[in-house]
């Protein structure tokens, strides 16, 4: 069975981080949180929920911060999320199944990503951005 590190970069996310971390605890083998300068209790909440928290001064470079998070991950695959992301119970079960069945020769798994939407609007679904991959390194386009 594969192992999964959930990697996040955060700043002042105390209001939403607990909800996000609650969603990933069922399948994450480790949770890596890189805090880029929170003034609230984000880091404390993350530690309380079992995450490994690293401080990194913000350098105006998302790729550098995300790559730093990936460098701290020890598992086979890295899965990145934003602090306001929520994973449904059904998708949590799919992640558990994926961990048990994924052929280890697979390098990257792309997942559907539904953006938040108002009740009267249709959701926007992307085949992007929520990857689970082996030692992923991101590069921002400039």
Regions found by a protein language model. Name each.
Residues 8-30:
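Short, well-formed alpha-helical segments that are part of the catalytic scaffolds
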Residues 1-5:
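Extreme N-terminal starter segment of soluble prokaryotic enzymes
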Residues 23, 35-47, 58, 82:
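A conserved acidic beta->alpha catalytic loop
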Residues 32-35, 54:
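Conserved beta-strand positions in the Rossmann-like core of class I SAM-dependent methyltransferases
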Residues 60, 77, 81-88:
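Acidic metal-phosphate-binding loop of nucleotide-sugar-dependent transferases
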Residues 64-70, 76, 88-142:
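Catalytic-site signature of metal-activated, phosphate-bearing donor transferases
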Residues 43-68, 72:
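Conserved donor nucleotide-binding strand/loop of the catalytic core
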């Amino acid at each position: 069975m594969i192992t999964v590190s959930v990697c996040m970069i955060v700043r002042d996310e105390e209001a939403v981080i607990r909800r996000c971390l609650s969603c990933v605890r069922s399948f994450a083998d480790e949770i890596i949180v890189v805090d880029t300068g929170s003034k609230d209790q984000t880091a404390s909440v993350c530690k309380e929920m079992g995450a490994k928290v690293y401080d990194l001064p913000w350098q105006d470079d998302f790729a550098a911060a995300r790559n730093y998070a990936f460098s701290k991950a020890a598992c086979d695959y890295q899965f990145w999320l934003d602090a306001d992301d929520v994973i449904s119970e059904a998708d949590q079960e799919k992640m558990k199944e994926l961990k048990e069945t994924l052929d280890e020769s697979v390098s990257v798994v792309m997942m559907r990503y539904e953006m938040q939407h108002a009740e009267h609007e249709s959701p926007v679904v992307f085949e992007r951005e929520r990857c689970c991959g082996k030692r992923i390194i991101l590069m921002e386009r400039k």
